Swiss-Prot record:
Superkingdom: Bacteria
Family per record: Belongs to the radical SAM superfamily. MoaA family.
Protein known as: GTP 3',8-cyclase
InterPro entries: Aldolase_TIM, Elp3/MiaA/NifB-like_rSAM, MoaA, MoaA_NifB_PqqE_Fe-S-bd_CS, MoaA_twitch, MoCo_biosynth_MoaA/MoaC, rSAM
GO MF: 4 iron, 4 sulfur cluster binding; cyclic pyranopterin monophosphate synthase activity; GTP 3',8'-cyclase activity; GTP binding; metal ion binding; S-adenosyl-L-methionine binding
Length: 332
């Protein structure tokens, strides 16, 4: 088996696969309030195309798949997609990133289909803030979904928390305390300038030093830990707490050095780097493994050493154009 390496000798064994660009929320850091039409149904990869695509990747050494969106649980065939992907020879870890609104209903069938891990977006514990950040979401549905999923013994449940200055950065302690009695990994994520105006990002970006400061100010002793999984987070556990917390800081501390992932958009493009505009249409080659591999290798050969999300804060020249897609169109 000839595995996938980029020009910097980074092994790629992980695919993040978006199965829809549609979402039942419009989170402020992911989608504009209006004016972003969803892809027509025939533009989105079918279930059979998805499975064949993953079979191609598995033959090239990919063993881990994360299903994303949009909101992946909006697809009525999501459980069957999970079941079929997990059945592919060589795929040993399947996870999903979801907003959790449908999780109370779908957590059990997803677990039975073979889902290993869950990432749930939850940027606040306050109902009014949640409604504002998500532009209309009901936080109780998410909390109910987390409660159901927590009883099903997934390998790991993670909460994704995008910190936004002036909106939720005062809730760090609440999330840290949540890990005391809940076996979850609360992951604080820096707000990224993807699909947002630069001016908005510069105003609302906040670094993650705040998390350590909060621990120190409240007498919370913590130590680094290693979590099995695919993410770029640095992970820690507070002494005596059941769960843990993680930091994902693409701006203040790049995670590119060990990048092992490729992103597949819902309409069948491969993006080797989250931030670059460059993408290659692989849909027409899904049925031809040889042609498929050539396109994937082309994407890897062009993959940059680092993204340049923080270019606005420096005098560096940008090597490539930033992505034109919003996060929901890439796959979160």
């Amino acid at each position: 088996m000839e595995k996938l390496y980029d020009s910097y000798d980074r092994l790629h064994d992980y695919v993040r696969l978006s199965i829809t660009d549609r979402c039942n929320l419009r989170c402020v850091y992911c989608m504009p309030k209006e004016g972003l039409p969803f892809f027509p149904t025939d533009r989105v990869l079918s279930q059979d195309e998805i499975v064949q695509l993953i079979e191609n990747f598995a033959a090239m050494g990919v063993s881990k798949v994360r299903i994303t969106g949009g909101e992946p649980l909006l697809r009525t065939d999501v459980v069957e997609i999970v079941r079929r992907i997990k059945a592919v020879d060589g795929i040993n870890d399947v996870s999903i990133t979801t907003n959790g609104l449908f999780l109370a209903k779908l957590a059990k069938p997803l677990k039975e289909a073979g889902l290993d891990r869950l990432n749930i977006s939850l940027d606040t514990f306050k109902a009014d803030r949640y409604k504002k950040i998500t532009r209309g979401g009901n936080i109780q549905q998410v909390l109910d979904g987390i409660a159901v999923a927590s009883k099903l013994h997934f390998k790991k449940i993670k909460l994704n928390i995008v910190l936004i200055k002036g909106q939720n950065d005062d809730e760090v302690l609440d999330f840290l305390h949540y890990t005391k009695d809940h076996d979850v990994n609360a992951r604080f994520i820096e707000f990224m300038p993807i699909g947002n105006s630069l001016k908005t990002w510069q105003k609302e970006y906040v670094g993650l030093k705040n998390v350590f400061d909060t621990c120190k100010d409240n007498g919370l002793a913590y130590h680094p830990i290693v979590l099995r999984g695919n993410g770029p987070s640095d992970n820690y556990q507070i002494e005596g707490y059941e769960g843990s917390f993680g930091l994902i800081h693409p701006i203040s501390s790049k995670f590119c050095e060990n990048c092992n992932r490729l992103r597949i958009t819902a309409d069948g493009y491969v993006k080797a780097c989250l931030y670059w505009n460059e993408e290659i249409d692989i849909r027409s080659a899904i049925g031809d493994p040889v042609a498929f591999r050539k396109l994937i290798q082309k994407a890897l050969d062009n993959k940059p050493l680092n993204h340049e999300m923080a270019m606005s804060e420096t005098d560096r020249i940008i090597d490539k154009a930033p992505t034109w897609r919003h996060m929901s169109q890439i796959g979160g």
